[in-house]
Regions:
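Extended, charge-enriched "interface" segments that sit outside catalytic cores
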Residues: 1-81, 361-367, 371, 459-475
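Gly-rich Lys/Arg/Thr-decorated short loops/hinges at beta-loop-alpha junctions or inter-strand turns
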Residues: 51-61, 117-122, 313-314
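Glycine-rich phosphate-binding loops that contact phosphosugars or nucleotide phosphates
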Residues: 78-254, 449
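Short beta-alpha connecting loops at secondary-structure transitions
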Residues: 122, 206-213, 317, 369-373, ...
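Active-site phosphate/pyrophosphate-binding segments
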Residues: 174-346, 351-354, 439-475
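C-terminal helical cap and adjacent loop that interface with cofactors, partners, or active-site loops
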Residues: 385-451
Length: 475
């Protein structure tokens, strides 16, 4: 239940405008009223399925369950802020994309470049790749005396994350001794599974537990995301409150009043009836740029599944594409207006930006640019959104708009929960498990084999044979 007033919740409510998904707006490539009516029984079943599994979907309970750990989160954040000038996250997938997205959304867009007295919180680096040049570059720009690392892996065995941990731990022990690790290293992991929890206990590290039943791509509202957000100065209670408010909205059985179910329903109809196997997410705000990265993992990893039914292999999934308004008007929108009808475009518009910049009168004698003077960049970006929405619509391409009154912790919490609920409903509509990722395991096992992990000898032989076959077509 939201701690904010009813009036505030209504004022800051994230809304969806789906009118441009319909045939009456975009023509023959849009969704018809009949298609929606035909899908309503499936939508009702999807809603019932999600509600029945509510207790199993532990991520959905986070707005309530994580309140009890907030004192520990805030204490750790205060420690980091007092100790460090730099906060580094070692993680990959949801352990990285969520913290990046929230940090970008809620902090100064050039946060790391600000002088420390203006930043008021440590610089944030999220190391989500094992490119050796990148790791070497990070070590060139940080002062370990004033750096705290947070290693995040639920399994405690993620190769990319644990390799980075080995590098950082060796460096820290060499400089500060084993007793100094606690001042520079935080662990976020499972309460008992995997290798990291044992390391954390051995060295008495500050440790945060990822709750049972919360997968990486659904983990932003637990310590995976909350610690980094608190270090950055975010009001994490408002973030959770916003998510809880959206969960309430998505608990309505009426599809026309349930934003998550409506989004899922329209995307599935678009995919099944109109061949829209691509979904573009295009926020018109630099602050939301990396929400598209986080959403891409959520949507792709949850719905990209293979099932065998009646002897037939069925494949599901819609390919997410990241875009940014207005930047990608000059790189992608040509495709979205004149290209094939194989995609939906989801815009995110912002009612009020936190800053605005006036366009001054300078070249009033040049009519081709003088018309811009007297306006502001806020007016310009809003006009460009409306213009692009119009262009995509009149070209006959399905699109919709997620409307954020402004970008703050409460509205961002709503957006996170909205996308998570949309994904859960979509999984039920398709009849698939949206919470596993079996397709990822093959690559993990191959990596283990190539690096000599015991027990993967047969996989190594398989890889060698594949290499021989591949040589036949190398130019």
């Amino acid at each position: 239940m939201s701690v904010f007033s009813k009036e505030y919740c209504e004022k800051m409510r994230v809304r969806i405008d789906c009118g441009n998904m319909l045939a009456e707006a975009v023509g023959k490539h849009g969704i018809t009223a009949e298609e929606i009516s035909e899908m309503l029984p499936r939508a009702e079943g999807a809603f019932a399925g999600v509600e029945k599994k509510r207790g199993e979907m532990r991520w959905r309970l986070l707005p309530e369950t994580q309140l009890e750990i907030l004192p520990a989160v805030e204490e750790a954040a205060e420690f980091v802020r007092s100790k460090a000038d730099t906060f580094v996250i070692l993680g990959i997938g949801g352990s990285a994309l969520g913290p990046i997205a929230v940090h970008r959304a809620l902090n100064h867009l050039y946060h790391n470049d600000l002088p420390s007295e203006k930043r008021k919180s440590p610089r944030l680096f999220v190391e989500d790749n094992v490119d050796p040049e990148r790791k070497a570059a990070l070590l060139d720009v940080i002062d370990t005396d004033r750096t705290v690392f947070n290693v995040i892996t639920k399994s405690g065995s993620t190769s990319e994350t644990m390799a980075q941990l080995l590098i950082i731990t060796r460096m820290l022990i060499d400089r500060y001794g084993e007793e100094g690790l606690r001042d520079h290293l935080i662990a976020t992991t499972d309460k008992q599974k995997g290798n990291l929890i044992g390391i954390a206990k051995k060295y008495n590290l500050r440790t945060f537990i990822i709750p049972d039943g919360v997968g990486g791509r659904f983990s932003e509202l637990c310590p995976v995301g909350l610690v980094a957000a608190a270090v950055g100065g975010a009001d994490v209670r408002a973030l959770l409150a916003g998510a809880g408010y959206m969960d309430e909205l998505c608990s309505n059985a009426d599809v026309k009043k349930n934003p998550g179910l409506m989004l899922a329903l329209l995307e599935i109809i678009a995919a099944e009836k109109h061949g829209a196997n691509i979904g573009v997410l295009m926020p018109y705000a630099d602050s939301l740029k990396f929400m598209a990265d986080w959403y891409a993992q959520l949507w792709a990893e949850s719905l990209g599944k293979k099932l065998v039914k009646d002897g037939k292999v069925l494949r599901f999934g819609q390919t997410p594409v990241k875009s940014l308004g207005v930047t990608d008007q000059h790189s992608q929108v040509q495709l979205y207006t004149d290209g094939p009808f194989d995609k939906t475009i989801t815009f995110i518009s912002v009612g009020k930006y936190r800053s605005d910049v006036a366009v001054p009168h300078v070249f009033d004698d040049i009519p081709g640019i003088a018309f811009l003077s007297g306006h502001s960049l806020g007016e310009l970006i809003s006009a460009e959104f409306r213009a692009t929405e119009h262009a995509v619509t009149v070209s006959g391409h399905m699109n919709k708009n997620i409307i954020m009154p402004e970008v703050n912790e409460f509205t961002l919490g709503q957006l996170i929960m909205l996308f998570e609920m949309q994904t859960a409903f979509a999984g039920e509509l398709l009849g698939i498990d949206a919470f596993d990722q079996p397709g990822v395991e093959e690559g993990k096992n191959a990596t283990y084999a190539l690096l000599g992990k015991p027990g993967y000898e047969a996989k190594l032989d398989e890889l060698k044979n594949a290499e021989e076959a591949k040589k036949k077509l190398i130019v």
